[in-house]
Amino acid sequence: MIITKPKDERILRDAAEISVDILRQLRDVIKEGVTPLELDILAGTLCSKYGVEPAFKSVGGYKYNSCISVNDVAVHGIPKDIPLKKGDLISIDFGIIHKGMFTDHCWTWSVGAPNAKNEKLLLAGKRAVDNAVNKAIVGNKTGDLGYEMESEAKRNGFNVFRMFVGHGIGKSMHQAPEVPAYGSKGSGYLLVDGMVICIECQVVDDSGQVVIDNDGWSARTQSGGDSVMFEYMVIVRDDQPEVLTDTQDWGYVV
């Protein structure tokens, strides 16, 4: 989506604010013993409270309010009724529909203090997406963003999932352009003022090969290595991108 109307921009901002507030409330109840399914049920309750719809239920028969991925599940995790344990990595990918506008964003936390490798993984994943966000300015291309994400992952000894990509967003969940977490500088789609994109990256302690569970959704690392995912909704601007789902100062330990 390219924003051309002030009304659309206002609705999009409101949607992002509500979406972040719901994710914040989910974050605040993550602890040992809580199940991803309980978190997903709470997400649905909060959507009803705010008068919004869970966006992911609009996608291809998906029946949950969120995607919750734990440890080696990198993305699209089905919320399971399995209690979280100390040291687990949990990613909550979440979005809403508010007055016809969609949101989509994600954060990863460690349940309690992470081990040294997972702390490095968390930092690399967050930096990868933060670095890409800084490149979301007019005149750059999607390959500039992808280059930043993959470079940061590999610099730390990790890889990215290439099967799943960021995307445009607005009046539908997935729009052009695709924003891969890999690429070369100066390649891909040109970024223009007012373009709204989701910049996401799954950084994995693995080869980057994907295994899909029998549930048809949960995407795991092939070797069982852990994974993290971070995602922001961003408006492309001339000098400095605007992060709509501004969770950049959040911590990664709960």
Spell out what each predicted region is.
Residues M1-V254:
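Active-site neighborhoods and metal-handling regions in enzymes and metal-associated proteins
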